[in-house]
Amino acid sequence: YGRRRHPKKLTPLAYKQFIPNVAEKTLGASGRYEGKITRNSERFKELTPNYNPDIIFKDEENTVMNQWPGVKLRVTEGWDEDGHHFEESLHYEGRAVDITTSDRDKSKYGTLSRLAVEAGF
């Protein structure tokens, strides 16, 4: 009690590495598939939109900013309805998100993935 944990060294995730080490749609990673959410469904009302053009992503801990000053987290895909994902994709339920950095520097993606895991995604 009362002691701060020392920050652990974050190791970047490897390309195609998952945490937990299972695919996105397995029970251990995300729970049961609950069904696609459409604009006309009741569950659509439960999704939280973000219309502010000045906000790229809520990052209360400023983890991306602390790691790379001046760089923001960029959400490229969240809830989706266009049908280009696999049939039971969590994007259709609003439970999956694709992210990158505002500078689109691919060398940061491994560390970005680790930050997402540490944040509970």
Curated annotation (Swiss-Prot):
It is found in: Secreted; Cell membrane. GO terms for biological process: animal organ development; cell development; cell fate specification; cell-cell signaling; central nervous system development; neuron differentiation; proteolysis; regulation of gene expression. The keyword Cytoplasm does not apply. SUPFAM superfamilies: Hedgehog/DD-peptidase (SSF55166). Disulfide bonds: none annotated. Gene3D superfamilies: 3.30.1380.10. Zn(2+) binds at residues 91, 98. GO terms for molecular function: calcium ion binding; patched binding; peptidase activity. The keyword Hydrolase applies. Intercellular signal essential for a variety of patterning events during development. Signal produced by the notochord that induces somite patterning, dorso-ventral patterning of the brain and early patterning of the developing eyes. Displays floor plate-inducing activity. Binds to the patched (PTC) receptor, which functions in association with smoothened (SMO), to activate the transcription of target genes. In the absence of SHH, PTC represses the constitutive signaling activity of SMO. This is Sonic hedgehog protein. The gene is shh.
